[in-house]
């Protein structure tokens, strides 16, 4: 369920971009992001870097479209979202708090969280997501600058990148558990 909640604002954005305006899609995605944050707060969990950053990203782009440039193309909006989430991911690593760390700390014991390999694993998983975000951004750039590409090609790249990162997020802790034994195995239980 955690991965669903993390991706819910982005799924909302992608779905609504097909059926309504970019502005509505952005504000609804921000609302879904706020709902996820509220859900975490109610459960006594911390506000996440990715969640808060996503709400800020969707809201800022929504206000930009409303107040500054309502004619911005859907492809440019998608590129801005992809660039924004890539920036959130890179920033989280630059400040030494990879965004996956907050989620991982909620499912491991304190002893596991203190292990140096625990932080390394979170950098690796965040790096996998960063790679996926980069591929999604490249797909958006291709859709803008190579107009002959079929629409589905960008969607396939984004879908494959996101699903690969989600799979890696589940697989990597299991791999570490099998390779290094029980202490590193507590990296993820969800």
Question: Whereabouts are the PLM-identified features?
Answer:
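Hydrophobic, membrane-inserted alpha-helices
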Residues: 5-14, 31-37, 57-62, 135-140
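Structural signature of hydrophobic alpha-helical transmembrane segments
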Residues: 15-31
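C-terminal ends of transmembrane helices
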Residues: 35-45, 169-170
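Membrane-interface helix caps and helix-loop-helix hairpins in membrane proteins
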Residues: 42-46, 67-75, 148-149
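Cytoplasmic-side transmembrane-helix entry/capping segments in multi-pass membrane proteins
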Residues: 47-59, 75-82
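Alpha-helical transmembrane segments
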Residues: 74-92, 157-162
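Membrane-water interface of transmembrane alpha-helices
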Residues: 89-107, 125
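C-terminal membrane-adjacent module
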Residues: 109-190
């Amino acid at each position: 369920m955690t991965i669903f909640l993390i991706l819910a604002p982005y799924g909302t954005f992608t779905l609504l971009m097909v059926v309504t305006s970019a502005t509505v899609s952005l504000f609804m995605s921000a609302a879904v992001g706020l709902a996820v944050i509220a859900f975490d707060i109610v459960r006594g969990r911390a506000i996440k870097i990715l969640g808060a950053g996503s709400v800020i990203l969707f809201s800022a782009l929504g206000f930009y479209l409303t107040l500054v440039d309502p004619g911005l193309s859907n492809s440019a909006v998608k590129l801005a979202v992809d660039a924004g989430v890539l920036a959130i991911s890179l920033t989280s690593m630059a400040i030494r708090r990879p965004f996956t760390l907050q989620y991982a700390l909620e499912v491991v014991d304190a002893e596991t969280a203190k292990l140096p390999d625990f932080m390394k694993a979170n950098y690796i998983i965040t790096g996998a997501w960063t790679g996926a975000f980069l591929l999604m951004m490249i797909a958006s750039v291709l859709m803008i600058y190579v107009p002959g590409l079929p629409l589905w090609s960008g969607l396939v790249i984004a879908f494959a990148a996101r699903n690969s990162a989600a799979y890696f997020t589940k697989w990597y802790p299991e791999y570490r558990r099998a390779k290094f034994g029980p202490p590193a195995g507590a990296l993820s239980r969800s």
